[in-house]
């Protein structure tokens, strides 16, 4: 498998992994169900995971629909959603001190390289001269 099909599969795998791992990791007694967390913090934890799942679902739908069909606007939206979501992992510790930790940076760093490769593989290409 080469080119666009490989990129579609790669973006699907990354998106599915990000969505599922967020639910598995955050819906635990150490995070959203942590009794030490105030209810408002638990609510924001839930919102963060819900947004991640929806963004990753949108990436998959865009990839296999309009991006696969070669529509440039869809590729731009896909790039904005996926790279924007990844950027949040690196920007959050700067904006909210004390929120950065090595596992979060590693999670984002590990997903960034294959995301860039997938985005490049599904990029719109000019046809003809």
Regions picked out by a protein language model, each given a short descriptive name:
Residues 16-29:
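Alpha-helical transmembrane segments of multi-pass membrane proteins
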Residues 35-42, 98-110:
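Non-cytosolic membrane-interface motifs at loop->transmembrane helix junctions
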Residues 21-23, 40-64, 80-83:
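Core segments of alpha-helical transmembrane spans in multipass integral membrane proteins
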Residues 68, 89-105, 124-125:
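Membrane-helix boundary connector in multi-pass membrane proteins
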Residues 112-129:
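Membrane-water interface at the C-terminal end of transmembrane alpha helices
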Residues 1-18:
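Cytosolic juxtamembrane helix and N-cap/initiation of the first transmembrane helix
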Residues 34-43, 65-73:
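Short juxtamembrane and helix-loop transition motifs at transmembrane-helix boundaries
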Residues 52-58, 75-93, 112-114:
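Hydrophobic alpha-helical membrane segments
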């Amino acid at each position: 498998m080469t080119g666009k099909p490989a990129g579609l599969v790669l973006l699907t795998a990354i998106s599915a992994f990000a969505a599922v791992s967020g639910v598995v990791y955050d819906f635990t007694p150490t995070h959203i169900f942590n009794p030490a967390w105030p209810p408002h913090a638990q609510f924001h934890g839930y919102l963060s995971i819900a947004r991640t799942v929806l963004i990753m679902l949108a990436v998959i739908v865009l990839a296999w629909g309009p991006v696969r069909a070669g529509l440039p606007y869809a590729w731009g939206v896909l790039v904005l959603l996926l790279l924007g979501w990844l950027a949040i992992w690196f920007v959050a510790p700067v904006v909210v001190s004390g929120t950065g930790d090595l596992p979060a940076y590693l999670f984002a760093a590990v997903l960034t390289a294959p995301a860039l490769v997938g985005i490049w593989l599904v990029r719109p290409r000019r046809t003809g001269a």
